[in-house]
Amino acid sequence: MHFHWIAIVLAALAGFLVGGLWYGPLFGKAWMKARGITPESAAGANMALIFGTTFVLNLVAAFMLDHLYQTYDAPLGLHYSLVVAAIIGVGFVATSFGVNYLFSRQPRSLFFIDAGYWITVYLVMGAIFGLLA
């Protein structure tokens, strides 16, 4: 099995950048409100640890996505990669969030922000693999 290391690293970076946009200018204020986070409480966070760990977790996700694409004998191209990424994002991640958020009585807005982020991340990662791998 040959891993596509350039695509893996680029996909992880892209996921990280999507997060910066998603939880920053796009939905940052709504997410903080839904989570009950204030600017004061956010100021005490160890952002180096959070960002570093987030990037490592994005690397793991990208690596596993590459492994998944290679495990099944199917053509790798943009369309196929996006279909698989959508199945993962919507079919596994968003549904898992939905169940957890229902039982923990989280706001619907938080579900849409967080699930939408992961669907978008997997679609972006899938596009990168479809174009580069």
Regions found by a protein language model. Give the residues of each.
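Juxtamembrane/disordered regions of integral membrane proteins
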Residues: 1-133
